[in-house]
Amino acid sequence: MSKLNKTILADFEAAQIQRKLPEFNQGDTVVVNVKVKEGNRERVQAYEGVVIGTKNAGLNSSFTVRKISHGFGVERVFQTHSAIIDSVEVKRRGKVRAGKLYYLRGLEGKAARIKEDLAAAAQAKAARQAAAKVE
């Protein structure tokens, strides 16, 4: 691919990446609000679970969220810059060392729990309090 084509492609991708989501990593518990179209109406559906993996590839970036629904593990891959994602909220920060948490698929119950990163939680709380003082 020529340099001109790469430049045009990079400019197009930069224009498509419109909004910023909050920063989250593997092990974090997030709530992803997804736009769901049913017939002629649209509603927002919440999907809460643990981020088990992320893929950072510019416009093709994605993240995988795993939750337990009625005793079964359900995983869903979301495109980071997709129009169907309404918002993402980080509920709690997990403390993990692995890049991909695929080992959670084989664990059940208490074994599948992830320790909370208390330092990150304290920083987030301080940031929220500072923002509240500004308002």
Swiss-Prot record:
One of its GO terms (cellular component) is cytosolic large ribosomal subunit. It holds the Pfam family Ribosomal_L19. Keywords: Ribonucleoprotein, Ribosomal protein. GO terms for biological process: translation. GO terms for molecular function: structural constituent of ribosome. Disulfide bonds: none annotated. Belongs to the bacterial ribosomal protein bL19 family. This protein is located at the 30S-50S ribosomal subunit interface and may play a role in the structure and function of the aminoacyl-tRNA binding site. This is Large ribosomal subunit protein bL19. It comes from Xanthomonas euvesicatoria pv. vesicatoria (strain 85-10) (Xanthomonas campestris pv. vesicatoria). The lineage of its organism: Bacteria, Pseudomonadati, Pseudomonadota, Gammaproteobacteria, Lysobacterales.
